Swiss-Prot record:
UniProtKB keywords: Glycosidase, Hydrolase, Periplasm, Signal
Full protein name: Alpha-1,4-L-rhamnosidase
Species in which this protein is naturally found: Formosa agariphila (strain DSM 15362 / KCTC 12365 / LMG 23005 / KMM 3901 / M-2Alg 35-1)
Gene3D superfamilies: Glycosidases (3.20.20.80)
SUPFAM superfamilies: (Trans)glycosidases
Amino acid sequence: MKNKKRLCHILKYIITCFLFGVIFIIPIQAQIVLQTDFTDSENARQNIDYHFNVFNRITPLNGVKIKTPLGKPRVCIVRPLGGIVKNGKPDISKDSYKWDKKSKTFYTDFTVLKNQIDGVINSGYAIHQIVLDNPSWAFQRNKNGELVADSLKVSTYGNAEPPKDYNAWSNYLKDVLKFLVNTYGEESMLKIQFNIGREIGTPSHWSGSKEAFFEFYKISSSAIREVLPTAKVGTHFLWGSSKNAWGTDFIKWSKANNVHYDFIGVSFYPFYNKPDRTLFKEVYAKDFAVIKDIPEWHKNAKLEMHEYALIKSLNKAGNAFENAPKAQQNSFIVGLMKMFYEHNMQNVFQWGQGTNFEAAQEALFSIQGQTYYTSTKNGKPLLETNDVDAIFIKDVSNNIYNIMAYNYNANPNATTDEHLNLKAKLDVPPGTKVKVRFALYNKEKDTMSWSEWKEEATQGNEKSKSVISLNAELPVFSFLKYEVKVQ
């Protein structure tokens, strides 16, 4: 009798809930499915390069020291020609083009330029790029040696003024290239790229107009290639959504005027706590695609990231910053490399010693030479603002499949883990035994540790193809790596 009364009460409660519109929802744990088909050759994009080998150094007169043990570090020499500032005043002693007041003539002196190049080489490093950025201070003089208002104009980074005499600048660059070829050999110089300008669009790097710079680039590249016809030349702009983004216009102008470039560099200094600067699909669309993915882009050119840092703060002058925490650095860089592999970008030029995201770098270093496969993403994260995705890679020579996944959030206080289902279709029959191991980035210890190898069996209904399915819980500000070895 008591059971009948209890059942009656339950039925009345349910009827009341429906009458008043009360709906019960059984909570279902959200899951993100990331997958690729390794059996479909159309998903294969490119062989993976290690993109953290280039290091910026400003006027390196005392050699170079780079701590990272990974890869083969190369150097980008910044401001090698002079035009530098010291304690807010022009430092003419570093110039390679000078004005002699007594004889009232211009002359070249490549002693400091040679010291920089020799210093890099003697330190055991190759040179990736020489930046032809700040003109020597003497280029603020007209052809008669006269200065406007009889004083030099000084910017944050030194001489940001366009040369007063473009013809003199052209002849000077020819002398620079002749000196380099005669001193180090043509073969060595063809391995180095020459970057005309630095972070153009920033008034403290180039005070002239956009049109003036385009003409400056044309004159400079022509002078370089007159001496070294197959020299690699290019330039460096701000990111596409910045206030003074000239990159898109430069690409269109180059196409219309048949002006050559082998590469374009772009700066990228995202604040780690701003969603519009850390969501990779959005960032690529507005900062890089507007340069690289337009019809006028030279198909054989490469897009590089000539300055990069994930930053926490920036000083008022805009020339110094504080790095984001290590956990954010490591998880973010995996997502950044996903963007690089997907869109065929190359080379992250770093300041410092390359120690901001070492755990991620080691994992990324281990997949160089392997093949990147594009993938799909389905489902929603438990926390809407978590940015989660994965990199799928095939090591053909060793019959190993790698998967790297990351979880990033622009909110430093985010704590929500995400539940992932990682799937990959392989060229093996169902029931094939594979060995699996994984490593998870520990943000407290800033390290990764590997699990033991575990045997799994592939699944599926096809005769010669099957799927490996892996479930993982991925903390925010972390990344993981799976290795799947076919026996």
